[in-house]
A protein has these predicted regions:
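C-terminal edge strands of extracellular/lumenal beta-sandwich accessory domains
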Residues: 26-36, 40-70, 120-130, 145-178
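Non-catalytic, beta-strand-enriched accessory regions in extracellular/secretory proteins
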Residues: 75-108, 140-147
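Surface-exposed beta-strand/loop patches in noncatalytic accessory domains
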Residues: 85-91, 115-141
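Bacterial N-terminal signal peptides that target proteins for export
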Residues: 1-10
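Membrane-associated feature with strongest affinity for ZDHHC
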Residues: 176-243
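Bacterial signal peptide processing site
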Residues: 21-24, 238
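Non-cytosolic beta-sheet module surface loops
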Residues: 102, 110-114, 159-161
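C-terminal motif of bacterial Sec signal peptides marking the signal peptidase cleavage site
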Residues: 16-19
Length: 243
């Protein structure tokens, strides 16, 4: 993940990237990262994505029943839309096939509620996953696999055998959950406005979400510190030496 400089482009921002997904912090958005795949060095997605997926897993109105086919056929169904849990019925004791066409280019995480094999294909080509991890959630999701996908391309998803021949699948576009993290060089839990990364992954050590540290080399100086009047030091970073 490459640090980026502060960019004061608040006026260029559009609305939140999804109706129920979190919007990244406005005035420092790195617009180019919204179209890139999963960044190098990402070892795990932010737990906030799984938490959001659980909202859909726990909401009956967000569940959509789909019956997979045995292999790709003319009747193979598509997982259409986002912010849904697709309850996919598989062929008895066999692998099931569904289709998925992303509306936006980027990294797509597929959260599952059973630990089964999960493969994405473009035509006859099996895609390499960008990331695959087990996950512990309160709603029963067990793992996710991330693929870098192109908008408008129809992919084939193959789901391995599952107990009860049923598995829940929740597709989430990873970039919709980008969060701005700031370098905290002095370890006081407040970061440097001018050194930050935009990521939907677990941040590297030394990066935090709080900012406005006016001296990131001194842990006693930050927005949460008590001001000491009369010492010519702005301890609480509010621009005043007296309060």
């Amino acid at each position: 993940m490459k640090p980026t400089r502060h960019i004061a482009w608040g006026a260029l921002l559009g609305p939140a990237l999804s109706a129920c997904g979190p919007a990244p912090e406005g005035e420092e958005l790195d617009l180019s990262s919204q179209e890139q795949g999963l960044e190098a060095g990402c070892t795990a997605l932010s737990p906030s994505i799984a938490s959001h997926s659980c909202l859909h897993a726990n909401t009956s109105a967000d569940h959509v029943a789909v019956t997979a086919t045995s292999g790709l056929t003319a009747s193979t169904p598509s997982l259409t839309g986002t912010h849904k849990q697709f309850d996919v019925t598989l062929p008895a004791g066999a692998t099931g096939t569904v289709k998925f066409t992303p509306g936006t280019t980027g990294s797509w995480a597929f959260y599952l509620n059973k630990s089964i094999t999960f493969t994405a294909k473009s035509g006859a080509t099996t895609l390499s996953s960008a990331l695959a991890q087990a996950v512990s959630t309160s709603c029963g999701l067990t793992n996710y696999t991330v693929y870098n996908l192109t908008a408008g391309t129809t992919y084939t998803l193959e789901l391995g055998t599952a107990s009860g021949n049923l598995v829940g699948v929740i597709p989430e576009r990873v970039e919709d959950y980008n969060t701005r993290y700031y370098q905290d060089a002095d370890g006081d839990a407040y970061g440097n406005n001018n050194v930050s990364i935009l990521s939907a992954c677990v941040p590297p050590a030394g990066y935090v979400t709080a900012r406005y540290d006016c001296n990131d080399s001194n842990a006693s100086i930050n927005p949460g510190a008590a001001e000491i009047p009369g010492n010519s030091v702005d301890e609480n970073c509010n621009g005043s030496l007296s309060n």
